[in-house]
């Protein structure tokens, strides 16, 4: 189990959102052209471009569908930082993807419950603006989650490996 967790973690962050965004920056010529952005994201969902997995990384969450409350708070800080760092053009691209991706996902995947950016959508952009070396993105990603992962694992051990979601309320009797 540890092998898979550590291997997955090693691939997780840098390869997903930041590499996807770099790919979009390189292949979408006019970042302000909604149709061009939508067309490229459509090809991404169809598995024709980027890593060919048919995913738009940073979009969607297992529990939060209408919005990820963590992302809403984080985004306001990202906008201020982008303005202070002169990265408004990049921020506009993120905003465009945030607007277009849910429409495309609903259309192509027939997911109508709602899809929104998750908290990781902007994380790499922030690390980049702060001048943090890309080699540290994955450790930062992990550090931010270790307490939650640990608590989740303890709950799994006590709850017989049942999947636990944040919106659920435990009905188990308290253990003494």
Predicted regions and their residues:
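Single conserved hydrophobic/aromatic residue that forms the stacking wall/gate
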Residues: 2-13
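Acidic, carboxylate-rich catalytic segments that either coordinate divalent cations
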Residues: 30-31, 39, 44-53, 57, ...
